[in-house]
């Protein structure tokens, strides 16, 4: 007994894994379905009866030909079966009714032309949009028959156009004219039929047809079995094209559907079993293939799911959806397999769609698609929505269930969404959805969007826009600050080789990125890390150990800095001092202390303009760059406050405020309300405006440096420092303009802010800087609530447009401008001028774009920390 319970326990523990493994494509079931589908057994199929020999004529009226063809079909069926042949030519007719054991064969060049004469379409038992009724006979109709076929290379033309059937839908786009179109859906027939069904009105009392405006299908077989439709072309259907209803054993093979009319579904098996649709071409005004099982109360009463359906080797062009389940799906649907199809059109809206609502109810399960190639679709590759027709008049509370849906080996080149799932609000009834080994490029709006109540929506090797899509529970970290920090550590195991360095490098980019990492370490120390591994605290400690490597490698015991030259007076080389200062505060050392003194000394002796603002570098004599304000002043302020007496420190702070304010006066452009990249005091540089000395354009990252400098200087300034307000006022002025230039669609910013040009691009480093300042500025009380909202929008835009998950589950910040600058032009310290860097738009566009540039990694980490500290990353 103990052994039995032990075995049972092991079995139960294995159930979730085994169940999930069985939930995808099932080859054995596929083969079982394929082998179970029966073709029609048409006795005496070789006996051919040509309609022209039995009274049909090309110059006869539609009524005359209708009578002749129907009489012949009945005769052939009565004789035990055979083939009724439509020879080459155009044959006008009214509704045709198929009988058992009859094949209707259209020879190549034959056109069966259905006339727009409503009286030729008598009332028959059918269903209209999933509701049982008496309505106009479909063009080709059958009821309770077996072993029938429509074959041949000819054409079945339903006669639909804007002057005939299509105008009945009540839409002016399809020819409807108020007061002119006599019969149409706007007369209320559709709503009346829906109410009859909801109220349980008996079928025989639901009589429509003449004068009611409910258009007939092109082909509709009801309660029939063993059906073949092969090779024909079907065009211009009044309504749905092929509509087998409550049928069994249906094969649709090699059919071409061209129907751009309203509700022009290509093939709609409804409450059918054992269906094969293969080698077909669909170009439709609605869904290409839509599997159905009755609408609302009628579907529940039929209680017959559509099941055991194979779709393969088809091409879908225009249409609302390629393969669709619903929306008339109250009876449920199960065991659908679609494979080896091609779909491509800017008007094809979805590839696989399941649509239903809580009027329907029903169980939709075991829906599988694989090996489908998509050029483009308009909305989503996979869409499941349980909110279809939210204003439908019906009795609600019948919650549908969608489960066990898989998509595998599907590629798409362009869409708005990759996966779009809209679950219900009350019941968790969308679950076990698996997208595996798929690649969707050119996704414009959002890679995946899942709303409502869902469970076990799994993405396995799903690549969207080059980024691996992970379920939240599969992410190694639940915060982006930690995730990108550890991703960089994994990519670059030695901190002194960050930013694509081949050898140890002293550079401002190192300091920016590593300071972001330091803030991540400090925020998540003490057991707060979201790392999914065994020892989260040790994982967090790895950050600080990584950061310690840099000063240990770059600064010797005498305080000498590898690669640093004092005489260059390069402000870029000072920026990393702020990181070293913070590390020194945590881990004091004599070497760091000496190095910091050297770097502060540089700032004390840095050449300046006549107005007292730092030159950017010796080779950039007499030039003020927005970049330089960030490179020098935050360390300048922090070091002074920490190491100088209050009076001397205040003098330093006053100097910093003066430089920030004077830079505003010299670089601000009233026309654009933006700040130019740089200013030349002499107005003589080749890139400078000869009248005011400004460069031509606003480079977004330069402005990002400038506003980050303001926030960091404010961090260093004591609360009672009198001139803080000047910086806060200027920060508000700058961020107001930044938000004005925020791209409304994406929430991020273009590389060159003052140019509208197709070559301009959305750029990640500046966008990260602006997001960081907006969010931090709000948290610190410098900026109002509207700026936090702009920051959230920006951060979400960065995630949607720039963050990529790599196959190894690291993340990357993409679309980073590698570098941009100005000159240098000829000067006393310049060895070789660089005339390419002329500040023109063409120049900015010529610089390379790359992933994981440290100038963006650091600000993105900071922006992420702001989201996390403010509880906005939920």
PLM region spans:
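Right-handed parallel beta-helix
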Residues: 108-109, 146-154, 225-235, 248-259, ...
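Short glycine/acidic-rich loop motifs that flank beta-strands on beta-rich extracellular proteins
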Residues: 81, 93-95, 115-117, 136-137, ...
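Extracellular "leader-to-stem" segments immediately downstream of a signal peptide or signal-anchor
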Residues: 2-7, 12-13, 18-103, 107-223, ...
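Asp-box/WD-like beta-propeller blade repeats and closely related beta-sheet repeat scaffolds
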Residues: 162-179, 592-631
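CBM-like carbohydrate-recognition segments
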Residues: 449, 473-484, 488-511, 520-526, ...
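Long, well-ordered core segments of solenoidal/helical folds
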Residues: 479-497, 537-562, 594-613, 653-679, ...
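Extracellular beta-rich repeat passengers
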Residues: 329, 347-472
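Oxyanion-binding "anion nests"
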Residues: 707-754
